[in-house]
């Protein structure tokens, strides 16, 4: 019952937003369709669907066509790509178990997988931060900087630590007499 009410509210909100911002809604729908197509095709380059999610985030951040448009697009693009790749990093094990698409699967057997993903995420967040710093943000600037410079890393650290612990536990169960 509760989820039915929630979904009806979402549909109503979506229709209202689509009516208010038809061009944005069209761009977002096209990007979602591209993500869906790339995922169904098993795209091995994680940046392809991540780029589409960056387009979605750009449209969310972009309120009007003014002098800050390009900077907002750069901020949103990097942030969206970061979110998509971080989500893939977090979901990799479960996606593998359930046979679902994950854009990082092709890279996951690399011995430096965690560092590889971390470097991608650092590069994306550096792009996001550089673009953000060009914006004339006054309200909540410190809060936003805190999120950009440290808050976004909380989830990555949690995921990486969980992966490292699992790897260590698996290694210990395979070699019970060995100390680490």
For the regions a protein language model found, what residue spans apply to each?
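Single conserved hydrophobic/aromatic residue that forms the stacking wall/gate
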Residues: 1-6, 10-11
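Active-site alpha-helical segments that house and flank conserved acidic catalytic motifs
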Residues: 7-8, 70-94
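Nucleotide and nucleotide-moiety/phosphate-recognizing core
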Residues: 11, 20-21
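Alpha-helical phosphate/pyrophosphate-handling elements in metalloenzyme active cores
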Residues: 40-79
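A structural signal for well-ordered alpha-helices, especially hydrophobic packing surfaces
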Residues: 61, 83-86, 132
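Acidic, carboxylate-rich catalytic segments that either coordinate divalent cations
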Residues: 150-180
